[in-house]
């Protein structure tokens, strides 16, 4: 076991602490010259474990120059870590400088850091990539000994992970002895992450350090005072019960799966906050100052509750939080664990959490998540080949720092795990794209960013391309947004341009915890004033969070195993029993499809459990095929668990609608004709550097960016359909926007194992998804009564009884 320097040993002793086993194991790995992946629960001291070898080295051999680079998924987390690191450094009187470098860092400080860096620099992948675009980067990183990647699960399987992996390959060239360290609490397959971290797949070079298990979390499902609702996915019915829990605890975080739901829940809680407890709201669309105020109030213990989204999933260390509430189903066991970890943030004390299911299917999902956490099961991560638009951006960044040869660049790129098997021909296509923009665009000087000289070295064609790159580099491409403002200029945050376009003067909507009335749109601003009138909720774009495959499998098994049912509330058991009597229950290895007439329409419900994204895609494809078959489809709705189509003519042969060739025919046509591919192209065009978001002193509006990318998209589709970025956009549209992998699995099941049940009326299991048809027709936030009436009528039909005279929400 590693010995600590006396000054560090004394610091632990003065606090009454003893270094944990995994913290010393990280020091052992460092002394053996090995990289390391640390997997340990929240509150186990992962951050200190990651930095401990660096502190020891700097105590034993003080040096100037950059020693340790820390990479975080969030700017706020980097700032938080700086504060936490400075405590032991100052208490031990160590001459170690720790600084952050993010988009919020001043240009003067950034310039100084390039010449005289601190010993420890805390940053994000995007800021690191920009730093590598400067000629000074070679000297700056030559002294680097360690890179520490926090919350690695938030990076590795994504485009940000591709960028970070490429950056690590460059850093390893500049500092050959650099060690790589990654930290996480929620890794399902450490072998995959060790391979990603190693770069070359040699996982034996990466030690796996596992922390001791902490106290088992205290998780419960909050049941309503009445019955579990048939429909909805928000848990809004439980506002009073949640408020009681807030009052009974010191500080609570109320997690919601969407920003719009966070606004609704905040309003619901405020309406029943009879004790006038201080409650805040935090999500990614709010103004930065509003988010920082909420974070500061939480850190100071001034709030009793904070309603939040995924913006607070990672790394927040507020020790006074003693309750986490998950509104609606958590969608994955890893996400639930991550959120539970926000409570107590101490290893030896159980984190307390409540799950508030939105409906009966979500009750099953909540129980599945609880069981998965208990069993130590994590959601699997899907690693894929590196994105080509990210590679194009990286090549441009390195060209800005120094000339390079093709052979050296290819070899270096292949040292990044996502690109380790990159074909030479594909690399040449990416290099050619950076050099000319592609065949159809090569006549335009603006796309000829790098040129090869007679000496075989590639250089940037003109200094303006370097400035252009640094202004526009980044992986996160936001949708076109408008700033929400009061007339006095105060900014509340941003909403999507599409939502703003649906509003007229005097329309109302909830935002930033306020009810707002639209006054008008001017330029990039949506002007509003406060109002007390009822309000809608902004609809935020992007894919919804789908249920994980692990939880979906557990829910399937619940349905198929009646011996599990005694664990469930009486009304959930009654629901499943009624389904078993009136139809059949879905089996894990079969695809149940029900058809039935209702009110002059013909319905088909498919219980596929592949998540909302895949179901949305399949709904579009199946209704297209129904149209071709002359079934006169009217529409469809999708949930995480099922798809329901409704048409004027009945479906008699569902197998024909679900054949696997739908991915070769209708899928290709649909994606190419829909806005999906254009949206994906917009993102890859910005990331790949084909279109700029910013010029010196001026930022393009979302509409201007969309116009530019749509124009180029049409040109390339016509004149160069094999263009690199069209290929990249197609891959994005398939994998991220349509979840084509899960779609394929669904169709494979359907190929041989469809169970078709033709019914005289709606089944009990179909009620939750059919209620969504009513939800599609009415504005969010104003539809509850209408939906309750619709749900009651459907329940009455499914159960074979007359509807109650007074609709019940349960």
Residue ranges of model-derived segments:
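Helicase motor core with emphasis on the C-terminal RecA-like subdomain
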Residues: 1-14, 18-44, 49-456
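Short, well-ordered loop/turn sites that connect or cap secondary structure elements
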Residues: 30, 476-478, 503, 510
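Extended, highly charged accessory segments
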Residues: 410-413, 417-481, 495-496, 538-540, ...
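Short, acidic/hydrophobic/Gly-rich beta-strand patch recurrent on exposed beta strands
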Residues: 483-486, 529
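A conserved acidic, glycine/proline-rich C-terminal tail/linker
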Residues: 489-508
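Nucleic acid-processing catalytic cores of prokaryotic defense/repair systems
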Residues: 512-513, 641
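Short beta-strand-centered aromatic/proline hotspots
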Residues: 514-521
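Short, solvent-exposed secondary-structure boundary/capping segments
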Residues: 522-539
